[in-house]
C-alpha cells in the first residue's frame, strides 16, 4: 500500500498524450424502482503532434466514466496533416448531426480562434494557427465530432498531386 504510484491528471508521462475533459453531465435512467443516476463524460485526447481523438464514457461515478472515455477516445484517433506553420493545408467543413464546423487556415501567429469543444480538439491536435466557426448546433459532442470529421477529410499537397497524376511542382505554379 505504501508504494502506490501517483497518477497524473493531464499528461501521460510515457507517451506524451494529454487528455482534457470537455463536459461532465449527470444523466438519469428511469427504471422500475425509480431513477438511476450515472455520469457521462466527453473528453478529448491528443499528443499535440497531429493525433487527436474524442471519446465518451458513461459510468456510475466520474472517475470510471473518464477511464471509459479515454479508451473510447483512443479507439477513435485521427491523424491531422499539419503544415510548417502548424496550420491545416486548406479550408474544410466538418459535419456531425446538425452541427457544422468551418475550419480555415490562418496566418502564423494568429493562434487558435475557436470556441468550446472545437478549440479543445484543435489545440490537442497540434494546430496553432486556425480560424473555426460553429454553425447549426451548440451540442458539445456533435461539434467535437464535426471537427474530427473535417480533420479526416484534409489532404496534403503531395496526396492531391498523386490523386491527380501530376507532379507536385505544378500545384505551386501560378
From Swiss-Prot:
Domain of life: Eukaryota
GO BP term (any one): translation
Methyltransferase as UniProt keyword: no
Spans traversing the lipid bilayer: none
Alphabetized InterPro entries for the sequence: Ribosomal_Su5_D2-typ_SF (IPR020568), Ribosomal_uS5 (IPR000851), Ribosomal_uS5_bac-type (IPR005712), Ribosomal_uS5_C (IPR005324), Ribosomal_uS5_N (IPR013810), Ribosomal_uS5_N_CS (IPR018192), Ribsml_uS5_D2-typ_fold_subgr (IPR014721)
GO molecular function annotation: rRNA binding; structural constituent of ribosome
Cellular compartment(s): Plastid, Chloroplast
Pfam families reported for this sequence: Ribosomal_S5, Ribosomal_S5_C
Domain S5 DRBM, first and last residues per copy: 17-80
Swiss-Prot/TrEMBL keywords: Chloroplast, Plastid, Ribonucleoprotein, Ribosomal protein, RNA-binding, rRNA-binding
GO cellular component entries: chloroplast; small ribosomal subunit
The keyword RNA-binding appears for this protein: yes
Job description of the protein: With S4 and S12 plays an important role in translational accuracy.
Family: Belongs to the universal ribosomal protein uS5 family.
Subunit-structure text: Part of the 30S ribosomal subunit. Contacts protein S4.
Domain observations: The N-terminal domain interacts with the head of the 30S subunit; the C-terminal domain interacts with the body and contacts protein S4. The interaction surface between S4 and S5 is involved in control of translational fidelity.
Name of this protein: Small ribosomal subunit protein uS5c
Lineage of the species this protein comes from: Eukaryota, Rhodophyta, Bangiophyceae, Bangiales, Bangiaceae
Amino acid at each position: 500500500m505504501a508504494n502506490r504510484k501517483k497518477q497524473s491528471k493531464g499528461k501521460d508521462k510515457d507517451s506524451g498524450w494529454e487528455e482534457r475533459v470537455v463536459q461532465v453531465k449527470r444523466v438519469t435512467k428511469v427504471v422500475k424502482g425509480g431513477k438511476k443516476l450515472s455520469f457521462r463524460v466527453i473528453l478529448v485526447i491528443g499528443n499535440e503532434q497531429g493525433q487527436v481523438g474524442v471519446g465518451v464514457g458513461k459510468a456510475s461515478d466520474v472517475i470510471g466514466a473518464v477511464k471509459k472515455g479515454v479508451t473510447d477516445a483512443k479507439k477513435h484517433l485521427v491523424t491531422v496533416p499539419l503544415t510548417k506553420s502548424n496550420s491545416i493545408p486548406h479550408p474544410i467543413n466538418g459535419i456531425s448531426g446538425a452541427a457544422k464546423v468551418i475550419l480555415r487556415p490562418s496566418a502564423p501567429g494568429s493562434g487558435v480562434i475557436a470556441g468550446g469543444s472545437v478549440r479543445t480538439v484543435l489545440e490537442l491536435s497540434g494546430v496553432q494557427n486556425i480560424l473555426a466557426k460553429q454553425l447549426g448546433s451548440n451540442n458539445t459532442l456533435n461539434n467535437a465530432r464535426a471537427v474530427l470529421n473535417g480533420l479526416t477529410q484534409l489532404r496534403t499537397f503531395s496526396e492531391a498531386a498523386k490523386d491527380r497524376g501530376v507532379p507536385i511542382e505544378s500545384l505551386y505554379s501560378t
